[in-house]
Amino acid sequence: MMMLNPSNGGIEGEKMKKKAKVVVIMGPTGSGKSKLAVDLASHFPVEIINADAMQIYSGLDVLTNKVTVDEQKGVPHHLLGTVSSDMEFTARDFRDFTVPLIEEIVSRNHIPVLVGGTHYYIQAVVSKFLLDDAAEDTEECCADVASVVDQDMVVESVFGRDDLSHGYELLKELDPVAANRIHPNNHRKINQYLSLHASRGVLPSKLYQGKTAENWGCINASRFDYCLICMDAETAVLDRYVEQRVDAMVDAGLLDEVYDIYKPGADYTRGLRQSIGVREFEDFLKIHLSETCAGHLTSLSNDDKVMKENLRKILNFPKDDKLRIMLEEAIDRVKLNTRRLLRRQKRRVSRLETVFGWNIHYIDATEYILSKSEESWNAQVVKPASEIIRCFLETETESGRDPTSGKSIERDLWTQYVCEACGNKILRGRHEWEHHKQGRTHRKRTTRHKNSQTYKNREVQEAEVN
């Protein structure tokens, strides 16, 4: 008889010490993660925890591709559309919410299944060591920096209002090592670091040393025992699928959702507006609304409800119509950015293996995506995934960590690389830099850069001779 979860209160004393078992399903967008998680309920008593950063927010159900109530098939789903759209929900927030939730699910003798493509969310739960903990724990001990508003006040009182507006440059002067770790536009993190220094006299980089930095992202001493599954498919097949999915989203009401959330001059770095498919329509909506309100489009009513209903009609305007061109370009940008996203997600999964030593089981959904056959889905996806999980539940040894890897590439958390050939693109850490150098775009630009430099050098030499 299979033991579902060794952490249940009814298990014998020695088994109570064993870690609870958690299934993780990750992978690129469009690969079928949510569908697999729901179908596993036919084989195991599962509860699903959403690990998609945008699906956590309420709203934009079509655009973020949330599983519908019908698609959930009665399987319990958690953290799906539960966070206010304007809130910032960090990896630490996700971890702090999810860990107790996993324990709660285990107490019901059910199997928690963590599902999503936001791999830094998953990493925050799977790894016991979250790199930002040291800094944030220090903040919590200091009443002067208890909120974002207070952080601004602390930084302003010490460095002045003018310096506050140039926070990244100030941080580079104070602690260049810490500045290298974050993006120049990450104002929340910049203020966090500056407030630490202002209130405690501590260099942020000093906090990221020792055990936390050494074990960051690894599964050493993890809270639970993890079965790590990655849904995958050929990139070209996923490209075609996500493009078709965007078209289907437009038919299903994507434009209505974007219209509802549109706000001129909105902050696209926080909350639900970070979603792919929001910012891409900003220019189109700005022109569309201004012309409609000015009465230039007599064929469309100014009534809010009717305007939303007529958005898709713009796609039937003459091909040379400015609004139709802008709308089609916006839809194409959504497709492009979605294709880019799935490539980033694939790279991140690979990094979890090569850099952090995760033992990941891959399930190839290519045949199903091409055929749309439920027979193929069951044979190529559900059956192998169920066998992997069944073996995981029956084994006594931990499954998530691969002891033979994880140190294959030295992790460099603090070094920033700048690629001049690619327009001064910033890469953080040796792994990102090495991966970037192998890319086709970088190689092409490097070749052009070298040829251009050779030509310039030849011109200089000829000028000196003459």
From Swiss-Prot:
Disruption phenotype: No visible phenotype, due the redundancy with IPT9. Residues 437-451 have a biased composition (Basic residues). One of its GO terms (biological process) is tRNA processing. Its cofactor is Mg(2+). Its EC number is 2.5.1.75. Residues 52-55 are annotated as: Interaction with substrate tRNA. It holds the Pfam family IPPT. This is tRNA dimethylallyltransferase 2. It comes from Arabidopsis thaliana (Mouse-ear cress). The gene is IPT2.
